[in-house]
Amino acid sequence: MVLTEQKRKSLEKLSDKNGFISALAFDQRGALKRLMAQYQDTEPTVAQMEELKVLVADELTKYASSMLLDPEYGLPATKALDKEAGLLLAFEKTGYDTSSTKRLPDCLDVWSAKRIKEQGADAVKFLLYYDVDSSDELNQQKQAYIERVGSECVAEDIPFFLEILAYDEEISDAGSVEYAKVKPRKVIEAMKVFSDPRFNIDVLKVEVPVNVKYVEGFADGEVVYSKAEAADFFKAQEEATNLPYIYLSAGVSAKLFQETLQFAHDSGAKFNGVLCGRATWAGSVEPYIKEGEKAAREWLRTTGFENIDELNKVLVKTASPWTDKV
């Protein structure tokens, strides 16, 4: 992979001194509303969503190399970032049309790579739902869409992070045993597709290739993969791309995510960091809604800090610098 000088500078801004991307993800919109709604009777307000993002940015970006935010509710938080922290902004609309299994990609209406760059971002992030077994017609439509985003990022000379969420059009429950059995192929084959230089992607943000809750030694109930099988899937994922790739936390607990990173490393995965979201900050939602800003800050300074500090310690032992790949 060849980087322009500007893209290299931007990636360095998003990384720590080791060349790892230890980024805090808080571009959640629909998921944040649902989390907040658990603790109050009224619809979460824009002001509440904006304020919590500001609090998390203010309290935790001093311990992260960068932060991912959304332009809908996250712009005030971009002003609260630690001066050393890089900024990624999400380009996609939240969620997808549940009346169809197509999960078509869609950019935010009044945003572009140019506007994201003008906002001070060091990278554009775009989320794509992708089923490698969908019709060629549907997947060509999705690929063309990603080509457009990639070309915009080339024009603006800004790094393009593609987040791939694999799914199966026939299986509605991504947490099921049924999906766990097909997940490795879905994740790995999608990574192969989008490693093609035609997409102009600089970093892939991906899921781990297994549902860890069904791995021998991690599973409480049914086991879908032995430890050896799971390790082979991590190896296959490593071989699937020549691009830097980072893991998303997919809403699992902080402890399970840390254990997963260790397992990935031990299996031979040379991942280049993480974009960790709810595993770090989700616990701040309840004190924020029930008790307000002060209680949320207290949670972030204690448990939130512990989550991110533990994660950073694990990263030092498990991640590889992205500079090895460029």
From Swiss-Prot:
EC number, UniProt record: 4.1.2.40
Catalytic activity: D-tagatofuranose 1,6-bisphosphate = D-glyceraldehyde 3-phosphate + dihydroxyacetone phosphate
Enzyme class of the recorded protein, top EC level: lyase
Entry keyword Lyase: yes
InterPro entries named among the record's database cross-references: Aldolase_TIM (IPR013785), DeoC/FbaB/LacD_aldolase (IPR002915), LacD_aldolase (IPR050552), Tag_1.6-dipho_adolase (IPR005927)
Recorded GO MF terms: 6-deoxy-6-sulfofructose-1-phosphate aldolase activity; tagatose-6-phosphate kinase activity; tagatose-bisphosphate aldolase activity
Record's note on what induces expression: By lactose. The operon consists of lacABCDFEGX.
Entry keyword set: Lactose metabolism, Lyase, Plasmid
GO biological process assignments: 6-sulfoquinovose(1-) catabolic process; D-tagatose 6-phosphate catabolic process; lactose catabolic process via tagatose-6-phosphate
Pathway info: Carbohydrate metabolism; D-tagatose 6-phosphate degradation; D-glyceraldehyde 3-phosphate and glycerone phosphate from D-tagatose 6-phosphate: step 2/2
Record's keyword annotation contains Lyase: yes
One Pfam family from the record: DeoC
Additional free-text comment from the UniProt record: This gene was sequenced from pMG820, a laboratory-derived deletion of the naturally occurring plasmid pLP712.
Family statement drawn from the similarity comment of this UniProt entry: Belongs to the aldolase LacD family.
Stated name of the protein: Tagatose 1,6-diphosphate aldolase
Source species of the chain: Lactococcus lactis subsp. lactis
